[in-house]
């Protein structure tokens, strides 16, 4: 290269200007392999560089144009909406919903359920694809005739199934018919379909609602399931427990069954001259102690209000036995000063533990001090005293007479506050008051139990019963309210299985008690509920103290 040209190239490089080239000429370093090499062929089309992406300014212009178009559409739609009458706008909102700011939602609704079937339901794409690729269900190649024939079940040779036969032609039943018959028998015994056996269809919510519910569920801690505080009517959930006196069996009639007011203990007494105490566990009920009273068939035994004493009377004696549980001493009360009764049998203890009421002969009621066993005073009614009881506050005494009348006495003044005729009663047999001071129940000789409001018994001369229970046909000899005043137990000792449990305040009878087919209750002479209604016990003439666990109540 000449020296002048080299100098010119150096000057051009320093100044930043490129040397002038003739048109159609290429630099030597691109045209050949080297400065002096032969020219190369142009690169193939596959090696060309991709076209450059649009610049950010162009993208911004496109976004602005789309936004401007959306604004124009929104303005035009609003103008059209202004021209529509209010009725038409309301109708569109009811049909299409509120899609004022969401045109895509309107389009999805107009597409119909066909599009919704293919919408994503929350599953992954793989799961959705797998659901669509299920092979069609294949039909069986052949059908076995023996499989289609219904298998017949013999009803005659099974003693349990024989009772379910309605007539002699049902000596054999198919499995389906037997299943239906068993279902009918169960519902008849339970008084309907239990809540746990009901098959109710629950409505499924949308995905958004379920997610909201899940969020609400996770926002708090604690118990989400709680039992109802009030006892439902219809069916009483209960189960049979071991007999209370299983560890001391007897064949003599049980005259008294009572739960201890403070401990998990039940007392059983009867005509076998013994008072027995058992620990209640529902399984074995181990015996704690038995007190034998010689030649003293027990008519009634009862705990004191504080649970420290047991009082017992006999069928043919005027002696009142008092057993001190703390000291372990048996104290006989042979004679009460001023009391001229030859036989002391029926008595009641006041809820506050202050008084002892003895039902005498010739219509006399004797009030004694519980602590000293001394006579305070006497009250007299017309006719014979059939039954008596204290009010829940221990301030009043209710007495049922043999003439079908009910007397209400004031304990402090020993004056008669009211007197009324028990509706439909020829002569009374039993009476009971609820612990909440709301109800008075009167049982008569014709099997009717009238339930009154206590306020009406105090204020009205002819009160009307809230409800007359007519489920018994013989004289009602036992009445007992449970501590929560939700159950009234009624029974008659004159007929087998004559015991019912009445739901309050509906005054309806629980349909699943007693189970008539079992027939293990027999003649009921006494009943009682545990302090918190967890257990129910009754004594019969066969010497058994039957006990049941009431599942609605969690405590003893």
From Swiss-Prot:
Segments for region (Disordered)? 1-70, 111-143, 193-219
Q: Which GO terms describe its biological process?
A: ribosomal small subunit biogenesis; rRNA processing
Where composition is biased (Low complexity), the residues are: 43-65
What InterPro entries does the annotation carry? Utp18, WD40/YVTN_repeat-like_dom_sf, WD40_repeat_CS, WD40_repeat_dom_sf, WD40_rpt
GO CC, any one term: nucleus
Alphabetized UniProt keyword annotations: Isopeptide bond, Nucleus, Phosphoprotein, Repeat, rRNA processing, Ubl conjugation, WD repeat
Quaternary context: Part of the small subunit (SSU) processome, composed of more than 70 proteins and the RNA chaperone small nucleolar RNA (snoRNA) U3.
| Assigned protein family | Belongs to the WD repeat UTP18 family.
Q: What is this protein called?
A: U3 small nucleolar RNA-associated protein 18 homolog
Per the UniProt entry, what species is this protein from, by scientific name?
Homo sapiens (Human)
Taxonomically, what lineage is the organism? Answer: Eukaryota, Metazoa, Chordata, Craniata, Vertebrata
